[in-house]
Amino acid sequence: MSVIDTEIAVDIVKIYAAWLERFGDVLERRAVGELVDLFDDDSYWKDVLAFTGGYRTFGEKPDIARALEATIDGTAPKGVRQAKGRTAPRLVRRSAKWVIEAYFDFDTSVGTGTGFVRLLHDEADPANPRLWILLTTLQELAGLEEGVGARRPSGLEYSHSFAGDNWADQRRKAQERAGDHPEVLVVGAGQAGLALGARLSQLGVKTLLVEKNAAVGDNWRNRYHSLTLHNEVWSNHLPYLPFPDSWPAFVPKDKLAGWLEAYAEFMELNVWTSTQFLGADFDQAAKQWSARVRRSDGSIDVIWATHLVWASGGTSGVPNIPNLPGLADFDGPVIHSSSFLGGNEFSGKKALVIGTGTSGHDVAQDLHSNGAAVTMMQRSPTCVVSLVPGGTLVYAVYSEGPPADDVDLVTAAIPFPVLQNSYQYLTKKTTELDRDLLDGLKARGFKLDTGPDRTGFHMLYLRRGGGYYINVGCSELIAAGEIALMQHDEFETFVPSGLQTRDGSTRDFDVVVLATGYRDQQEGIRDALGEAVAERVGTVWGFDDNYVMSNMWQRTGQENFWLAGGSLLDCRLYSRFLALLIKADLAHVALPETELASTRYDSSGLTSIIGAP
C-alpha cells in the first residue's frame, strides 16, 4: 500500500467512526426522524431477524421511517460500536458509486447483532457521507451463544477420568442415542443439512441428520464422472471450517464429497447414513413430529422431534420426467441426468440428450469425450456464459480479500433493485465478452436467452434454479458441429429405434438422457408428508414478497417445519439465521415481530439504469 493509499484508508476510518457515533446516538435515542435524515433519498434498509424477526427490505425514506417506527421500541437497539474482528472500513466502487463499506455491532432486547453499511462518499463533502444501504442482522441470542472461540469447551474432562469413557467412546454413544427424541431432525446430510447441523450443534441443540446414501458426500460422489463446481472455492466455505488455501479454485465433485464426509466427522455431527426417511406426522397438541425412518438393516424406527428440517436438495429434489410421446416405446436405456455417472459405457453409441441447461451440457460433453455421437435437443432458450471471466464475475466480491463471513453480509445487504441493476450490467458485460462464442451458437440454431429482465444466469438460478449453462467447453463443441443440435419443435414422437421428426424422417439413437431438471420441492414434500403439509408450505424457491427464496431458511406455513438448501454459499450464509430461529423457538425467546411487508418493487425489469445488452 502506498503512502497516499494509507492516508486515504486512515481518512476513511476516521470518517466512518464519526458517522457511526452519530448513527449510534440517534438509534439508541430512538429518534426516528433524525435517523432517517442520515439516509440518502434513494436508500434501502434490509433486516434479518434483528428488528423484524424475519427478512424484510424497506426502500426510500417514507417506508424506512414507517418500519423504524413500528420496530425500534420492540428491538431496543443500543451499544452501537465498531464491529470486533471485522474488515476495516474501506472505500470501494459499487454500482458506479464510490461508497464506504463498513460493519458495526449492536445489542438488542434479545441478543447481539451485526450491521453493514454502504455510505455514499462525496469528495466535495467527505465528512458527511449519506447512508445508501443499511443491513441489520441478529447474530447471537443473549445467554445462548455459540460454543466457539473463547467459549469453546476446554476438553479437560477427557483427561480426568482414566477409567471412564474417552472422547471416542462418548461420540460413539452419542451417535447411537441420537434418535432418542432429538430436538431437531434434519432430512438430508448434503451441504445444507451439514451446515445447519453444525450451527445447531454449536448452539447446543440436540440434532440428528438422516441420509439415504451410504456415506456423507455421496450426493456429490455419485454424480457424473466429470462434474466440477462452477464457482470458485473462496465463495464455497462451510461454517467454522474453511477449505485449505492449497485447494483448486474449481473443486472436483469427489474432492468436495470427501470434504463433506470429513466435515461431518470433524464437526461431531450425528448422522445416520443408509437411512431412508419414510414420512412424518405432526402432533398439533404436543407440538412434536413423529417421523418414520428405515435403517440399513431394514428395521423401521420412529423418531420424535420438535422440529423437522427438509434439507434433501434445495432446488434439486425429485427428478422431473417429462411425458414425451412414444418414450415408452424406445428400445434403448432412458436415464435422468441425476442417475448419469459417466459416458464411458456409451463409446461409439448414438446419444440424445434432452435439455440444454448445465446438466445437459455437461452430460453431452462427457458423452462426446467418451466417443459417443451426441445430439442435444433444446426445449427452451438457454442463458450461456463462459466460466472465466463471465461466470465468476457474480462471485468477484469473494475474491477481494475480506473473509467469507464478512462478504456474506455484503451479499445479504444487496436490495432487489440494486441486485437487478447489477446483474443487468454484468449480463451486458459478459454478453460482450462472449460475443464470438454466442454468435457461433446462434449460427448453429441454438436459442439464447438472458432472462425476462436481462439479468442473466444467476438471477435465473434464484428465480427458477435453472435455465442456464456456465460454459466449460461444450458450447465450442456445439458451435463447431461436433455435438449436433435439434429443437424440440422438430420432434414428433419416439420410436423403438430413436425418434421421428415432424417432417416424417427418423433419427436413430442408442440411449436417451433426460437433462430435464427437477420437480418443485413442494412435490417432494407432498410425497413424504402429504397433501395438507405441502399445501401449507406452498411453493419452494424463487423470490417471495420479501425478496428472499420462497420458504427457504425461514418460517413456513407448517408449524415447526423448515426447508434448507441451495449452493454452498447459500448454506453458509443462511444456516446461521435458521439455527437462530430454531434455537429461539426451543428456548422460548420471543423475537421481534412486525406485520409490515417489504417495499414492493417492479420485478419485471422494464426500467433500468443501463441499456439493453
Language-model features: locations:
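Short, low-complexity N-terminal intrinsically disordered segments enriched in polar/charged residues
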Residues: 1-41, 170-182
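Short beta-strand edge/turn micro-motifs at domain boundaries
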Residues: 2, 103-173
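A solvent-exposed, acidic/Ser-Thr-rich amphipathic alpha-helical stretch
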Residues: 15, 25, 29-96
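N-terminal Rossmann-like dinucleotide/flavin-binding domain of flavoprotein oxidoreductases
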Residues: 61-106, 226-296, 464-484
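Flavin (primarily FAD) cofactor-binding/catalytic cores of flavoenzymes
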Residues: 137, 205, 210-212, 254-352, ...
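A short, basic/flexible loop-to-alpha-helix module at the beginning of a structural domain
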Residues: 157-182, 335-347
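N-terminal Rossmann-like FAD-binding beta1-loop-alpha1 element of flavoenzymes
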Residues: 175-210, 358-368
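Glycine-rich active-site loop/strand segments that organize a redox cofactor
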Residues: 221-258, 381-448
